[in-house]
């Protein structure tokens, strides 16, 4: 994966959790969010299984010293669901669920 990143070649997105070997292969996760996940201690997609997306979001806010856009939480929700075996879905499919579950951030 490091060779792909350094060469500027994008990682293909995984269709299934079992095929996901690098954070950048997660649907909806690009280099910036992959770096954010690494910053909070997530280095491999499998580490997202059974994680609390809100805790990841809050950890990233603390690590950066800035409030992250709520769509980051939507994206973390999508990634955790995907690694739990769900089909890939766009992050914005989680916006209504996030608002209902967590209210205003």
What residue spans do the PLM features occupy?
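C-terminal extensions
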Residues: 1-27, 31-105
């Amino acid at each position: 994966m490091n060779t792909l990143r350094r060469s500027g070649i994008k990682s293909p997105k995984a269709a299934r959790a079992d095929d996901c070997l690098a954070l950048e292969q997660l649907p909806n996760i690009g280099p910036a969010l992959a770096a954010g996940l690494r910053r909070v201690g997530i280095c491999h997609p499998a580490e997202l299984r059974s994680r609390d997306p809100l805790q990841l979001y809050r950890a990233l806010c603390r690590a950066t010293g800035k409030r992250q856009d709520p769509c980051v939480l939507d994206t973390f929700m999508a990634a955790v669901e995907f690694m739990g075996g769900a089909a890939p879905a766009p992050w914005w499919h989680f916006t209504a669920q996030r608002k209902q579950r967590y209210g205003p951030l």
